[in-house]
Amino acid sequence: MIMMKGFLGFLAAVLLLAVAVPGYADECTNRGLLDTMYCDNDQDLVADNAPAGNCKDPSTLVFTYTPVEDPAVYQDLFSDFQAHMKKVTGKDVIYYTVHSNSAQVEAMRSGRLHIAGFSTGPTGFAVNLAGYVPIAVKGDEKEFQGYNLIMLVKQDSPYQTMADLKGKKVAHTSPSSNSGNLAPRALFPSQGLVPDEDYTVVYSGKHDQSVLGVVHGDYDAAPVASDVYDRMVRAGRVDANAVRIIYTSPRFPTSSFGYSSQLCPDLAEKIKEAFFSYRYTEEMVKAFDGADRFFPITYKDDWAVIREIADATGASYNEEGLKAMIAKEKEDAEKKAKQQ
C-alpha cells in the first residue's frame, strides 16, 4: 500500500516534466542532458547554481535518504547529522520520508526536497531531471564506499586474460543484476569479449553461487561484485587462493549525497561544509559497513561508469527512462501486495 501511494503520488511528476519553468535557464549556453529547467554552462554535467534573484533560501531544510523498507530506522540514524547540519547552516532540518525513487526525484524537482541521499542509479535521474548536485558518497579517510565488478576464474585454470574466455561457459547472476549481468554486458565489449556472442551465458541466481560454481568447476568464469566476494573470503566460505581475478572494473559508487541546485549559493556552500566536517556516529559506522564520513566526489568523474552502463543497457537518465522506472516500481509494488 505504501509503495502504491509513492507510485500514485509520483504520477504528477510525469505532467510536471512537461512543464517548462521560465527563468535563468532561458539564457543557457549549454544544457547537455539536463532538463530545460536547468543549465550547465560550466559543463560539469550537473545543474549550475541558481543565480541571485532566482535561488531559494528556505527557513527549514528538508532532507531524506533513499527509500528503504523501514524509513524510521534511517530517520533516527541521520538525526545527529541533521543536528550538525542545523548548527552549520543555522536552519532547522527535518526528515522527509519518501516511498519510491521516482517520488524522491519529483520531490526535489518540485522544490519540496533540498538535501538528499539518492541510490546509485536514480542519482542520474535526479541530476538530469531534478537539478540535483551530488557531492559525496559514504566513505572513510582514503576512499569512497563502493565495489568493483571482477571476473573470477579458478586458480589452476589456463585462463589469464578476458580473451581466453571465448567459447567458454560464464556464469552471470540474474538478468536484472547490475554487477552480475548489466555491467558485464556494458563493459566487457571494450575488453574484446561480448556476452552471449563470445561466451555462453548461464545464470547462477546469486553472486555467491557464481563464486562457488567457479571454485567447484561448474563454470569457467563468473563476473561478480567485489564486496560479495570479499565477504565470502572473510567468512571462510571461499579460499582466496582457489581463484584468480583477471579483470577489475572502475569502482562503482554507492548512494550519493547532495543538494538542490536551486538553493542560494551561500547556503549551498554551508551545506557542503556541513557534509564534509561531519563524522559518523558509532551507530552510523555500524549501519554503513565501516564508513565514517562523507567522501567528496564529482558526478562527472565518479558516476562515469554508471552512466556508461545505463547508456549501454538502454536505461538512459531521461524522461523515457524515468517512465520505465515508474513502471518497474508499479510492477514491484503489485508483486509485493500480492505476497502480503
Predicted regions and their residues:
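Bilobed "Venus flytrap"/periplasmic-binding protein-like clamshell domains
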Residues: 63-86, 121, 141-212, 219-220, ...
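A local structural motif
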Residues: 86-97, 189-204, 239-242, 324-329
